[in-house]
Regions:
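Secreted/periplasmic serine-hydrolase-like ester/acetyl group-modifying domain
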Residues: 125, 134, 138-235
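Hydrophobic membrane-insertion alpha-helices, especially the h-region
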Residues: 10-26
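Conserved small/polar residues in nucleotide/adenosyl-binding loops
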Residues: 236-243
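Short secondary-structure boundary micro-motifs
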Residues: 8-9, 42-43, 51-53, 198, ...
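Membrane/wall-proximal cationic-aromatic binding patches
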Residues: 30-93, 99-110
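Membrane-embedded segments
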Residues: 74-152
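N-terminal Lys/Arg-rich, disordered targeting/topogenic segments
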Residues: 1-5
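Generic preference for well-ordered secondary structure
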Residues: 39, 91-95, 203, 207, ...
Length: 243
């Protein structure tokens, strides 16, 4: 009888802890998987690079905006405030360091599906990515944040790294009443860099002359396939939806 009592008590405590952890994660929701920002509650967009793919889907689906800046790390220092000043629109920035064309295209599609009122996408297109396979994707995307499957959300709710870094920093922001991270600062590394002619020349090495690579039919087909599937297709789909 005592063993049964201890078993039931252990199960009860375990369930209570799991429910409490779930409630905290859903309420704070550092990656905006369940909801957008809550008015009066500051949030922190932590770091850049590896963390971007965790934040971006929630930003695209649950923030209120009219325009989006997206692309690879080349767009990380783009300033959302400049877009807002030029076109008088609410702007978010969702960059994917090393992102492939298909990865970014899939992100834009999910974002537009959740925000029909978006009027402008400013998208960086890296020339070298056009040479990749049109279906190239990153090796470790957090798919559990991209879909609507509640069962695989255990990977988010009970993720140790999520508790130790983004959730902890969000709680700190709330406690200390910091201002939320702006989309000028999110992903940006420019404040940590020094820009000058002297700095550039100190790291410059003149490249050796090389023969110009031949523009083959294989290269042409790769570029065309990328453009058709990961750029132009979305434009045609959007135009058809507007008609």
């Amino acid at each position: 009888m005592k063993a049964k009592k201890w078993l039931l008590m252990t199960l009860g405590i375990t369930m209570a802890v799991l429910v409490a952890m779930t409630a905290v994660m859903v309420y704070i929701d550092p990656y905006f998987h369940y909801h957008g920002p809550v008015e009066g509650r500051p949030y922190m967009l932590y770091g850049s690079g590896a963390y971007e793919k965790y934040y971006n889907d929630g930003i695209g689906k649950h923030f209120k905006y009219d325009a989006m800046i997206t692309g690879s790390s080349v767009t990380e220092n783009f300033m959302a405030s400049q877009v807002e000043n030029l076109w008088q629109c609410r702007t978010v920035k969702t960059c994917f360091a090393g992102g492939t064309l298909r990865e970014i295209d899939e992100h834009v599609k999910r974002s537009l599906a959740a925000n029909a009122g978006v009027s402008m996408i400013i998208r960086g297109i890296d020339e070298d990515k056009l040479l990749n396979d049109k279906d190239a994707m990153p090796s470790d995307p957090p798919e559990y944040l991209y879909d609507n499957n509640l069962f695989n959300d255990v990977n988010y709710i009970f993720n140790k790294d999520t508790w130790l870094i983004p959730l902890r920093y969000n709680l700190q922001y709330m406690r200390e009443n910091h201002a939320s991270t702006s989309f000028d600062n999110y992903s940006s590394w420019s404040v940590k860099a020094t820009f000058s002619k002297k700095r550039t020349l100190s790291q410059y090495e003149r490249p050796q002359k090389q023969e110009e690579a031949a523009y083959t039919q294989e290269i042409h087909d790769s570029i065309q396939a990328n453009i058709d599937q990961n750029i132009v297709c979305l434009l045609y789909t959007s135009d058809a939806a507007d008609e």
